[in-house]
Amino acid sequence: MEAGQKMGPAQEQRSFARRHPWLLGTAGVFFVLLVAITVAGIMTARRAEPYLHARIVQGLASHFHARVELDTFHVSLGNGLRGEWGVWAQGHGLRIWPPAEVAGVEVPNPPPTNGPPVEPLISLASFGFHVPLRYKPDQPIYIGQIHLEGLHIHLPPKSHFLHIAPAPTGNVAQPGSSGLPVSVQLGNVDCKDAVLILGTSKPGKLPLEIDIARFKLSGISPNNAMHFEAELTNPRPVGTIHTKGIFGPWQVSDPGESPIAGDYRFDDADLGDFNGIAGTLSSTGNYVGTLRDLNVDGQTDTPDFSLTHFGNQMDLKTQFHAIVDGTNGDTRLDPVNAVLGHTHITARGQVVRAFAKEDGDSLHSVGHDIDLKIEVNQGRIEDFLHLASHDATPLLTGDINLKSSFRIPPGKEPVHERMSMKGLFFLDHTEFSSTKVQDRIEELSFRGQGKPHDAKSPDHESIESTMQSDFEVAQGVINLPNLDFTVRGADIALKGTYKLDGGLLGFTGVAKMQATISKMVGGWKGLLLKPADRFFKKDGAGTEVPIHIAGTYKNPEFGVDVKGMPHSHPQRPDEKQSAEPQAQVAAPATQH
């Protein structure tokens, strides 16, 4: 090669190889060693699979005192999450049956060949974890994270654990023995697509099934509680419940008695899943208890709650204490403190899962049966009427005191058609929103007091009234069997119905005025009616006439039932009052 001529890359590599042949030899040896180590590692891992498979089954059987099956288990060499070389382990088809006896023996009797099949306590579609190659003999092997997928936990009813036959005694491992040659320390468990099924022995009930989209366990140690975070899928209303807390320790003798405590958050749940109501619900709270029995304290907020048939939105907030029966999902509420608009409502009762069979099918859920006792003290009647009215303006305003039963059975009809109530109420300081109706009430009051001229005055004071009655609500109709409507100068006893849809009125009754008929009319016409006063006096009233109210609350029709008037007779001066005043059916909490 001539002086000054440069070598190409290929020539430089050949020259370097001729000058340093030992480097190529060393690299070749390392490559061969790496291949040999990898092959040896793979062979060792494959040979260790049956041993580790058996040890895992034995360790789980010892911990759960139960029969354990594992379909497949494989190990391989590879990098971990932090780049550490180690062993990847994967398993499929893990099943753990309920414990054979309450305590003592970890290997149970085989499942009976006769009778119904026994569901596994735990079924797992797949799991995987990574174990680093670094290991110190005096320290446990640390597994940073275990991945689970397709976990099903099926807890039998409590009665199952009270009648379990003892397993045969023999050469079995002691409880608490892991069955593994070395100790293992776990970091976290991350699981996707889990289902918790809580069995029940109650007739006519189905197990409660809880879908868990994801959960994570941390702080795992034998016979101790662990921390968890979870996302639960709520079926109705559809939404995700975020929860975190402490679970455990796991009760081997009866897993359903394993303690649990935590907080939850449920956001933006669409109440439109339920036929007849609408709104976006959010809820937060905390719970404590066991998997079978939980005490829950929480609050809900639905700023746009409405009955879809009517469409008027109301702000609805609640605070509640609930006792949840985990075996069937039934919930006892004691109490619920709700605020609808400006009205405070106290409720106690239960929400029960309802089941039915249709056309010979198996038992299936048809919704919930809500059965409550409610009480209202110094609430506002317009809050209730606004919710159950097509118009933004309610029928009337005033203070309400109420005691009633409240029930919504399961069904496909809208809520306002399924809802039923039965109780008693007292309304005070009541005014009708319709000017036409309120004017008629005020005219009735002034004439009943014998002040007909004041009734015509545009500057007269507003007249408030009171109402009280027993009542029933069914299929969207309010039935009032003994409505007592009182204003100054008049007392009206009515019975009839009011239809929520359309506001149809249908009432009949008797109006009793303090003034005589002549004083009610006044003027020269009153003088002409003076001889007729004695025909309208009855039971201490200056005037008593049968009346009816029809039409709608917007356009009511008031009338006198003339057919009932001939039955009246002149009241003699010595005639005593024969009818006693109606007893109050719902005295107000406070008088004004």
Whereabouts are the PLM-identified features?
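Short beta-strand segments that buttress and anchor functional surface loops
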Residues: 92-96, 228-235, 334-339, 481-487
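Generic long, charged, amphipathic alpha-helical segments
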Residues: 464-467
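Intrinsic-disorder/low-complexity linker and hinge segments
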Residues: 167-179
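Membrane-proximal interfacial segments on either side of biological membranes
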Residues: 22, 59, 76-84, 136, ...
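N-terminal type II signal-anchor transmembrane helix
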Residues: 2-65
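Extended serine/threonine-enriched, polar tracts that run as long, contiguous segments within proteins
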Residues: 471-479, 484-493, 501
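Terminal hydrophobic membrane-targeting helix
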Residues: 38-157
